[in-house]
């Protein structure tokens, strides 16, 4: 009898224990469910309301700005080169360079996006893929330099993640080959390389400015915030050249070189009263607006660099000396 009661007592104790354990777990879970929202709300309030320097509003604002606010360069307009009458010999025209972030393109752009991009750029899909692979660890690369604004906008309108545009200036020479050696040309970064463009590069070059902008994840400018430093255009350069005389001298020289089957030729026209140079032309010449087929021997300004025999031009001086 005693053993039976003892067994029953043990059974009751086990049942009570089994009831207590689920209840303990229940209270633990419920306490966690109530405590977690309270902790989250408290933390959110701290981040959004309390101006704590380390983890509050200022911290979030700083972190957000660091990821979206950027300093953008404002390109400076290069000074004009004109003849004595103000006719343009070298001008700067606005263009757009296309920039890509290979990391974003590799991760976020679809195969269709890349095919559309290659078609818009006029290159094969294989070529584009090879370039992106080569720069896959970089966050910056040029897709195309100095495109006409409308052509670049067509690419930007595709809305492909990781592609943005940068405003630049490209030099244009209205007189073309007629003033090629005299005026010279600039490189793709707008630095003078030959002729007057090189000789007066410092004065012609402007000072770039900068501004604060907001950019999205793709690198596109969403909004201008403030101007940091304004851009200053370069100084204009007026030459003593008369473009009308320059055209006439160039045509006469080109005709004479062709007529006599000469390898080269130069002509200089001076104002006899002031000594100013009214025209200076050379053959062979080149088109400074398209230097894809440029030959080194056509770049040289022969009228300035080559040694030439004076020939009969000194005879008047000899006769004058004899008369005296």
Regions found by a protein language model. Name each.
Residues 1-291, 302, 307, 324:
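Periplasmic/cell-envelope proteins involved in peptidoglycan metabolism and beta-lactam response
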Residues 93, 311-320:
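Active/ligand-binding-proximal structured segments within catalytic/core domains
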